[in-house]
Amino acid sequence: MQYSEIMIRYGELSTKKKNRMRFINKLKNNMEHVLSIYPDVSVKTDRDRGHVYLNGTDYHEVAESLKEIFGIQAFSPSFKVEKNVDTLVKAVQEIMTSVYKDGMTFKITAKRSDHSFELDSRALNHTLGDAVFSVLPNIKAQMKQPDINLKVEIRDEAAYISYEDIRGAGGLPVGTSGKGMLMLSGGIDSPVAGYLALKRGVDIEAVHFASPPYTSPGALKKAHDLTRKLTKFGGNIQFIEVPFTEIQEEIKAKAPEAYLMTLTRRFMMRITDRIREDRNGLVIINGESLGQVASQTLESMQAINAVTATPIIRPVVTMDKLEIIDIAQKIDTFDISIQPFEDCCTIFAPDRPKTNPKIKNTEQYEKRMDVEGLVERAVAGIMVTTIQPQADSDDVDDLIDDLL
């Protein structure tokens, strides 16, 4: 027998009574975006659960994609069978004999939304249970926590049988908590921060600062690839490339070396905030981890934050580097992040950056520059690209193109 659909059980959105259908519709949209790499797959949702119709597509590939989508609590692959008792008996016997191992217990859980079906749920439980005993006489029934819970659902169009419950990613559907601007470098931390924001339903847009010729096309592609890895959790992400060369050259020419990093980060924050305002974002998200580098001391954060009143979310702020790496490996961004391309945060990094910069000093150095003009030109020069999910085979094609 071949799986015909995957039944989706919702996560935390089940508690959002007033906005329930908005959450469900957003989850449906996200599933359609992520599963768009499987052209024959279709998605339907209702108030209680979702249905992913495979239409001949390999179940295992689709299941791997579903495991990453936030808002899904669990899912079950299901067999579609003809809606009559004899067919159900044969299907249940075939499934049970294929999955049963010595000592396992079982339970039949039948329900029907089609109340015209010839047996009610209780009678169907008994009939199908007897059918299992007839082919597996040594099996034992267990009502609480059985090894195999065979679920049978009678719908208007057909009957569906499932026995597996596969854990989903949990969290909230991406886009149900508003929009945030993710400051995405090419490092390990910021993609993890983006992932954690996505998990809580934030629709992220990735803001990446590029400083050619100091940063290479390889660094830009790396940022694109990191963004694409994040699309598997909720669908398309807008990638915003910010031209940053002029600003970095100006800072280097007019400020003391010890303050280069602080001033650079203040400009980045101003620009990201301006983009956020233009694109109706609510927050800024970054990958700062307290004490990890000189620009991530509390004093540095205070000096950098001073340029905006917008909330700054730092999902990894209390994590050790190894904790962040563990998540990066889990979400498959780590190997990309360690590719040897310099980003604009490293190209002019001073040997001894100021770890406790003073706000009054940063403001004094910025008076030497046309801050507003620099910010306006950078924002005017942004390039926005839609990054979409892609199949693993596309990754191979991209690698071949890069080599050629």
Curated annotation (Swiss-Prot):
Pathway: Cofactor biosynthesis; thiamine diphosphate biosynthesis. One of its GO terms (molecular function) is tRNA-uracil-4 sulfurtransferase activity. Residues 60-165 form the THUMP domain. It comes from the Bacteria. It holds the Pfam family THUMP. It is an enzyme of class 2 (transferase). HAMAP family: ThiI. InterPro entries: Rossmann-like_a/b/a_fold (IPR014729), ThiI_AANH (IPR020536), ThiI_fer (IPR054173), ThiI_N (IPR049961), THUMP_dom (IPR004114), THUMP_ThiI (IPR049962), tRNA_STrfase (IPR003720), tRNA_sulfurtransferase_ThiI (IPR050102). Belongs to the ThiI family. It catalyses: [ThiI sulfur-carrier protein]-S-sulfanyl-L-cysteine + a uridine in tRNA + 2 reduced [2Fe-2S]-[ferredoxin] + ATP + H(+) = [ThiI sulfur-carrier protein]-L-cysteine + a 4-thiouridine in tRNA + 2 oxidized [2Fe-2S]-[ferredoxin] + AMP + diphosphate; [ThiS sulfur-carrier protein]-C-terminal Gly-Gly-AMP + S-sulfanyl-L-cysteinyl-[cysteine desulfurase] + AH2 = [ThiS sulfur-carrier protein]-C-terminal-Gly-aminoethanethioate + L-cysteinyl-[cysteine desulfurase] + A + AMP + 2 H(+). Its EC number is 2.8.1.4. Coiled coil: none annotated. The gene is thiI. It comes from Streptococcus agalactiae serotype V (strain ATCC BAA-611 / 2603 V/R). One of its GO terms (cellular component) is cytosol. Keywords: ATP-binding, Cytoplasm, Nucleotide-binding, RNA-binding, Thiamine biosynthesis, Transferase, tRNA-binding. GO terms for biological process: thiamine biosynthetic process; thiamine diphosphate biosynthetic process; thiazole biosynthetic process; tRNA 4-thiouridine biosynthesis. This is Probable tRNA sulfurtransferase. It is found in: Cytoplasm. Catalyzes the ATP-dependent transfer of a sulfur to tRNA to produce 4-thiouridine in position 8 of tRNAs, which functions as a near-UV photosensor. Also catalyzes the transfer of sulfur to the sulfur carrier protein ThiS, forming ThiS-thiocarboxylate. This is a step in the synthesis of thiazole, in the thiamine biosynthesis pathway. The sulfur is donated as persulfide by IscS. CDD domains: PPase_ThiI, THUMP_ThiI. ATP binds at M183, L184, H208, F209, R265, G287, Q296.
